[in-house]
Amino acid sequence: MASQSQGIQQLLQAEKRAAEKVADARKRKARRLKQAKEEAQMEVELYRREREQEFQSKQQAAMGSQGNLSAEVEQATRRQVQGMQSSQQRNRERVLAQLLGMVCDVRPQVHPNYRIAV
């Protein structure tokens, strides 16, 4: 009986060691997967930064020529607005006088289509 008990104990210990090895293997696998995921994430982030930097440089090159153009358009717009404002200041009094003259100087007239009923 003692040999059977000893054999069972050996089997239980072997099963326990096997379970520990399987658990260790699972932990190592989980660590490797986590490390691979982190490395992949870092690589993706590095690639994204490179592409973003490349995009920024191309955009800067394209906008450099447009930057001068937009500055010229901005300056032309300012000149036109200043011209309109000065024209408004010059003609303001004359236009107000015309408007007030049309509103205040009413000349009563009979409408040409009006027929006098007899």
Curated annotation (Swiss-Prot):
> Localized where?
Apical cell membrane
Q: What is the lineage of its organism?
A: Eukaryota, Metazoa, Chordata, Craniata, Vertebrata
Name the gene for this chain. ATP6V1G1
Quaternary structure (record): V-ATPase is a heteromultimeric enzyme made up of two complexes: the ATP-hydrolytic V1 complex and the proton translocation V0 complex. The V1 complex consists of three catalytic AB heterodimers that form a heterohexamer, three peripheral stalks each consisting of EG heterodimers, one central rotor including subunits D and F, and the regulatory subunits C and H. The proton translocation complex V0 consists of the proton transport subunit a, a ring of proteolipid subunits c9c'', rotary subunit d, subunits e and f, and the accessory subunits ATP6AP1/Ac45 and ATP6AP2/PRR.
Please name the GO terms that the record assigns under molecular function.
ATP hydrolysis activity; proton-transporting ATPase activity, rotational mechanism
Keyword list, A-Z: Acetylation, Cell membrane, Hydrogen ion transport, Ion transport, Membrane, Transport
Family the entry assigns = Belongs to the V-ATPase G subunit family.
Q: Give me the Gene Ontology terms describing cellular component.
A: apical plasma membrane; cytosol; plasma membrane; synaptic vesicle membrane; vacuolar proton-transporting V-type ATPase, V1 domain
- Specify the protein name: V-type proton ATPase subunit G 1
Polar residues composition-biased segments? 56-69, 78-89
What residues bear N-acetylalanine in this entry?
2
What Gene3D superfamilies does the record point to?
A: 1.20.5.2950
State its role: Subunit of the V1 complex of vacuolar(H+)-ATPase (V-ATPase), a multisubunit enzyme composed of a peripheral complex (V1) that hydrolyzes ATP and a membrane integral complex (V0) that translocates protons. V-ATPase is responsible for acidifying and maintaining the pH of intracellular compartments and in some cell types, is targeted to the plasma membrane, where it is responsible for acidifying the extracellular environment.
Which Pfam families has this protein been placed in? V-ATPase_G
Stretch list, region Disordered: 55-90
> Could you tell me the Gene Ontology terms of the biological process aspect for this record?
synaptic vesicle lumen acidification
Q: Which InterPro entries does this one have?
A: V-ATPase_G (IPR005124)
- Organism of this sequence: Canis lupus familiaris (Dog)
Q: Please indicate if the UniProt record lists Thylakoid as a keyword.
A: no
